[in-house]
Amino acid sequence: MFRIVPNRGIREYINTTYKEEFFLKATGIVRRIDDLGRVVIPKEIRRTLRIREGDPLEIFTDREGEIILKKYSPIGELGAFAKEYAESLAQTSGHITCIVDKDQIIAVSGAAKKEFIEKHISASLEKAINQRNVVSAARGDSNFVPILEDDVAESYKHELITPIISEGDVLGAIIFLSGDKKMGEVEGKLAQTAAGFLGKQMEQ
């Protein structure tokens, strides 16, 4: 049995695992391993869990003979450090600060966490990150990028998105959000420094 584990909180992990196992049993999906040990993850599961070509997956086994594939996020591995770093940046900048990988919000400070934490990022934000674009915009601007998949957050009108790059690979972004204050040169330099620091942390 293959159990696909999304990189989420434990409650969502349990619920999603149950749903995916039920889905596999209900549809009767079976995949054979080829002579190189490869197995195809069905397109439906890849779409649901946002697994893309080239995404790293961790492989685990348990005592019952199950093989567990877990999406790997280098930024997510920072855990408490990412949370503390977001808090420090929020205090320094005076803005809502988010640290994201290419799937979801990993850490947030300066705002109601329920509004952002562990929420999926929007396809537009994922595209901007992958293109390594630095975005400074206000709602209504042509280059404004919604942060969340559903974009129901109304606590910000201005944004500054700075990609995190490590060893040539883009891993996520540092995001500053503000309700009424436009981002300037100071915020830009702070975000660049913060993104560079996190990128170096990933190399260790």
Which residue stretches match the model-derived regions?
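Short beta-strand-centered segments at strand-helix junctions
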Residues: 37-49
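Short hydrophobic alpha-helical segments used for membrane anchoring or interfacial signaling
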Residues: 96-108
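Short, Lys/Arg-enriched N-terminal segments with co-localized hydrophobic residues
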Residues: 3-23
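Regulatory sensory and allosteric helical modules in signal-transduction proteins
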Residues: 115-150
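Juxtadomain coupling helices with adjacent low-complexity linkers
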Residues: 79-88, 119-126, 172-173, 177-204
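Short regulatory alpha-helical segment in sensory/regulatory domains of signaling proteins that mediates
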Residues: 86-92, 97
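A short, aliphatic-rich beta-strand micro-motif
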Residues: 158-165
